[in-house]
């Protein structure tokens, strides 16, 4: 009798995706982040669901309801800390996952890559609306500053901003709709993840060498299920350590004060995972220019497949491209640092230089490095 997992209509899908899936034999720990992101998403949906049972999306009670969750609900403090720090783990895994894709040339699977970029944007939108919900000072002013950027759009900008606000400023209507968005978006993300996997399984996984791995494939289970399990344990160890020992280290102290439209915090800044984009936004003195640069900093990922000039897919054997990649990584860390600093010298000029370098590396230097490496590989006799 044929095994049930190979014949049952539902189990067959699971079997082809997670059990009998042919996987390259040489994929490293950098390929763990897809499954880690899946775990992060599940943790966020579960903890978020339990938080939503006790949260009230009203300007008068939102802040108090979060305090109530932490003080009075059974393990509410733990659920909230897991949810808040789970977002940080989510973005850490996301950035490493995207970085892996750039380093090893995974972006040449264009459909998978494009769905991935859409996923990144959706997760960023979810995190942004979620940060507004506790209705602390930074929640309110972060929402005010970022939604206000819509008003930079010519002609329709202000109408658009007021439409998003549901009034003439960030208020009760804004909070209620942001809660609705924050609840629905993770399920949209889940649907997109399935599409992302669908396109990935059309081509199969890339591997560190960047060459066709079809000659040497191994079944996903038990090899990569065990390998992923190690990743899960490490992720949960880090998340629990954060949530239990230092739950507020990645948050902003201003968010412990209830939202007050009459008092502006000294430095308005988003959570750490948005600081690089915030630094690029602030580096341009013009409002519309800043908004366009902010969008370009993320949407530039969509054109990376078309900027691939090298004959080799992966950077594994391309030392010049490798050097530029690590300069890009250091540059993003610099931007993250600058995004959290006040708008004064020398931070302004450092932010502007780092922003210019960010776009130069992706648009000019890395494609040129690929061409130069092609030239160096040609026989010279």
From Swiss-Prot:
<feature type="transmembrane region" description="Helical">
    <location>
        <begin position="77"/>
        <end position="98"/>
    </location>
</feature>
<dbReference type="Pfam" id="PF00032">
    <property type="entry name" value="Cytochrom_B_C"/>
</dbReference>
<dbReference type="InterPro" id="IPR027387">
    <property type="entry name" value="Cytb/b6-like_sf"/>
</dbReference>
<feature type="binding site" description="axial binding residue">
    <location>
        <position position="97"/>
    </location>
    <ligand>
        <name>heme b b566</name>
    </ligand>
</feature>
<dbReference type="InterPro" id="IPR005798">
    <property type="entry name" value="Cyt_b/b6_C"/>
</dbReference>
<keyword id="KW-0472">Membrane</keyword>
<dbReference type="GO" id="GO:0046872">
    <property type="term" value="F:metal ion binding"/>
</dbReference>
<feature type="binding site" description="axial binding residue">
    <location>
        <position position="196"/>
    </location>
    <ligand>
        <name>heme b b566</name>
    </ligand>
</feature>
<dbReference type="GO" id="GO:0006122">
    <property type="term" value="P:mitochondrial electron transport, ubiquinol to cytochrome c"/>
</dbReference>
<dbReference type="GO" id="GO:0045275">
    <property type="term" value="C:respiratory chain complex III"/>
</dbReference>
<feature type="binding site" description="axial binding residue">
    <location>
        <position position="83"/>
    </location>
    <ligand>
        <name>heme b b562</name>
    </ligand>
</feature>
<keyword id="KW-0249">Electron transport</keyword>
<keyword id="KW-0999">Mitochondrion inner membrane</keyword>
<feature type="transmembrane region" description="Helical">
    <location>
        <begin position="347"/>
        <end position="367"/>
    </location>
</feature>
<feature type="binding site" description="axial binding residue">
    <location>
        <position position="182"/>
    </location>
    <ligand>
        <name>heme b b562</name>
    </ligand>
</feature>
<comment type="subunit">
    <text>The cytochrome bc1 complex contains 11 subunits: 3 respiratory subunits (MT-CYB, CYC1 and UQCRFS1), 2 core proteins (UQCRC1 and UQCRC2) and 6 low-molecular weight proteins (UQCRH/QCR6, UQCRB/QCR7, UQCRQ/QCR8, UQCR10/QCR9, UQCR11/QCR10 and a cleavage product of UQCRFS1). This cytochrome bc1 complex then forms a dimer.</text>
</comment>
<dbReference type="InterPro" id="IPR030689">
    <property type="entry name" value="Cytochrome_b"/>
</dbReference>
<keyword id="KW-0812">Transmembrane</keyword>
<dbReference type="GO" id="GO:0005743">
    <property type="term" value="C:mitochondrial inner membrane"/>
</dbReference>
<dbReference type="InterPro" id="IPR036150">
    <property type="entry name" value="Cyt_b/b6_C_sf"/>
</dbReference>
<comment type="function">
    <text>Component of the ubiquinol-cytochrome c reductase complex (complex III or cytochrome b-c1 complex) that is part of the mitochondrial respiratory chain. The b-c1 complex mediates electron transfer from ubiquinol to cytochrome c. Contributes to the generation of a proton gradient across the mitochondrial membrane that is then used for ATP synthesis.</text>
</comment>
<dbReference type="InterPro" id="IPR016174">
    <property type="entry name" value="Di-haem_cyt_TM"/>
</dbReference>
<dbReference type="InterPro" id="IPR005797">
    <property type="entry name" value="Cyt_b/b6_N"/>
</dbReference>
<keyword id="KW-0349">Heme</keyword>
<feature type="transmembrane region" description="Helical">
    <location>
        <begin position="33"/>
        <end position="53"/>
    </location>
</feature>
<feature type="transmembrane region" description="Helical">
    <location>
        <begin position="178"/>
        <end position="198"/>
    </location>
</feature>
<protein>
    <recommendedName>
        <fullName>Cytochrome b</fullName>
    </recommendedName>
</protein>
<keyword id="KW-0496">Mitochondrion</keyword>
<dbReference type="InterPro" id="IPR048259">
    <property type="entry name" value="Cytochrome_b_N_euk/bac"/>
</dbReference>
<keyword id="KW-0479">Metal-binding</keyword>
<keyword id="KW-0830">Ubiquinone</keyword>
<comment type="similarity">
    <text>Belongs to the cytochrome b family.</text>
</comment>
<feature type="transmembrane region" description="Helical">
    <location>
        <begin position="320"/>
        <end position="340"/>
    </location>
</feature>
<feature type="transmembrane region" description="Helical">
    <location>
        <begin position="288"/>
        <end position="308"/>
    </location>
</feature>
<dbReference type="GO" id="GO:0008121">
    <property type="term" value="F:ubiquinol-cytochrome-c reductase activity"/>
</dbReference>
<dbReference type="Pfam" id="PF00033">
    <property type="entry name" value="Cytochrome_B"/>
</dbReference>
<keyword id="KW-0408">Iron</keyword>
<feature type="transmembrane region" description="Helical">
    <location>
        <begin position="226"/>
        <end position="246"/>
    </location>
</feature>
<keyword id="KW-0813">Transport</keyword>
<keyword id="KW-0679">Respiratory chain</keyword>
<dbReference type="InterPro" id="IPR048260">
    <property type="entry name" value="Cytochrome_b_C_euk/bac"/>
</dbReference>
<feature type="transmembrane region" description="Helical">
    <location>
        <begin position="113"/>
        <end position="133"/>
    </location>
</feature>
């Amino acid at each position: 009798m044929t095994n049930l997992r190979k014949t049952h209509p539902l189990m067959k899908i699971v079997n082809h995706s997670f059990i009998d899936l042919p996987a390259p034999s040489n994929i490293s720990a950098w390929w763990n982040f897809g499954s880690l992101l899946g775990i992060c998403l599940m943790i966020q949906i579960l903890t978020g669901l339990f938080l939503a049972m006790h949260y009230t999306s009203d300007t008068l009670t939102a802040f108090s309801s979060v305090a109530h969750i932490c003080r009075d609900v059974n393990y509410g403090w733990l659920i909230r800390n897991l949810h808040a720090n789970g977002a940080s783990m989510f973005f850490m895994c996301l950035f490493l996952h995207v970085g892996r894709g750039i380093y090893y040339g995974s972006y040449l699977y264009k459909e998978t890559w494009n769905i991935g970029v859409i996923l990144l944007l959706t997760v960023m939108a979810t995190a942004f609306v979620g940060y507004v919900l506790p209705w602390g000072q930074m929640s309110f002013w972060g929402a005010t500053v970022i939604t206000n950027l819509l008003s930079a759009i010519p002609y329709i900008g202000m109408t658009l901003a007021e439409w998003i606000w549901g009034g003439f400023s960030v208020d009760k209507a804004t909070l209620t709709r942001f809660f609705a968005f924050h609840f629905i978006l993770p399920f949209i993300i889940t649907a997109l993840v399935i599409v992302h996997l669908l396109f990935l399984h059309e081509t199969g996984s890339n591997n560190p060498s960047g060459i066709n791995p079809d000659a040497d494939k191994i079944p996903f289970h038990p090899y990569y299920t065990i390998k992923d399990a190690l990743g899960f344990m490490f992720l949960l160890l880090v998340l629990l350590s954060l949530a239990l020992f230092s739950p507020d280290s990645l948050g902003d102290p201003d968010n412990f004060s209830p939202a007050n439209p009459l008092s502006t915090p000294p430095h308005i800044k988003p959570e750490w995972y948005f600081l690089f984009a915030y630094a690029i936004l602030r580096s341009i003195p013009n409002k519309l220019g800043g908004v366009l640069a902010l969008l370009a900093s993320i949407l530039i990922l969509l054109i990376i497949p078309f900027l691939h000039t090298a004959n080799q897919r992966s950077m594994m054997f391309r030392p010049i491209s490798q050097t530029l990649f690590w300069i890009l990584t250091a540059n993003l860390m610099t931007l993250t640092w600058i995004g959290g600093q006040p708008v004064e010298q020398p931070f302004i000029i450092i932010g502007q230089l780092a922003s210019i370098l960010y776009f130069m590396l992706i648009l000019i230097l890395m494609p040129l490095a690929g061409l130069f490496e092609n030239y160096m590989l040609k026989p010279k006799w």
